[in-house]
Amino acid sequence: MTLEELKKEIRPLDETSMEQAREHWIKIAKPLFSLGKLEDAVIQMAGIKETPDYELKKKALVIMCADNGIVEEGVTQTGQEVTAVVADNFTKSSTSVCAMSKVAGVDLFPVDIGMSVNVPSVTVKEEKVAYGTRNFSKEPAMTREEVWQAIEIGIRKVEQLKEQGYEMIATGEMGIGNTTTSSAVASVLLSVAPEQVTGRGAGLSSAGLEKKISVIKDAIANYQPDKEDPVDVLSKVGGLDIAGLTGVFLGGALYRVPVVIDGFISSVAALCAARMVPVSKSYFLPSHVSKEPAGAMLLEALELSPLLTCNMSLGEGTGAVAVIPVLEMGLSVYREMTTFEKAKIEQYEVLK
């Protein structure tokens, strides 16, 4: 699917369903607008699903797993072999997000979109673009064709999950070196200096952080990625996990499934999708604000406000999964609480 086709096919939210949801909130026997952002999210999802009467019975977490050639430059504390180990652990219910997903009732779908090795429990030939990206300190990370292939894989994953009955998709990632690629992409898209959006990732020393910033600065200076063209930016300094998640966000908009943003890497992908197809942003739900330097900046660029502020930076989709029970609680009030009329209480008026 081409970008022009996506722009043509992705439609705005259904205003009629949203208005019906707003009217129902007003009828519920509680102080008006007292659930704040939860009410807004329920209304937004009504617009996404084109009905004010919906449920969230099946929730999925798509975890894009990929390796990054830039780790050769010493910008990470650990080697890229860790990516494959953690990806395999997703299938064994032995990672942080696995434990959280059990509580939240979320099913995990790790995708090997670009790990440096095959992981039998995860790798599917049709979902793998490459065995890691190239080292962008020496050459562009990917070709445009590879970026588009990854985006299309993300879109197809949403289509498959919707066909399986999933009603909400959370986004996650695993890839050593992906805070470097995400910082590079964020620097370009936000038009800010690399040092303003680059953090220590999974625990870099001060010297390591300086190296990370230097590598990003040099790559941006060398390749001059076009901030008006996210595919160009991703191909030069991005990662396959970011590209795959960009596809998940676009797929959510295309197939009308709400997609939950996680943290830093996920927010970068969301911004890529929003820059490619602006209306797609209406289908994104924020979770938390990452403690990475660019976390708040990215949400601001997306014009979104986080529901959680937990000072998290773990990745894997942990923040996205954490917010799902909160959203479900808001929906439960919307669906189950009595109205003013049934409670025989005089309805509150919307005062101006």
Predicted feature residues:
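N-terminal loops that bind phosphate or other acidic moieties
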Residues: 2-352
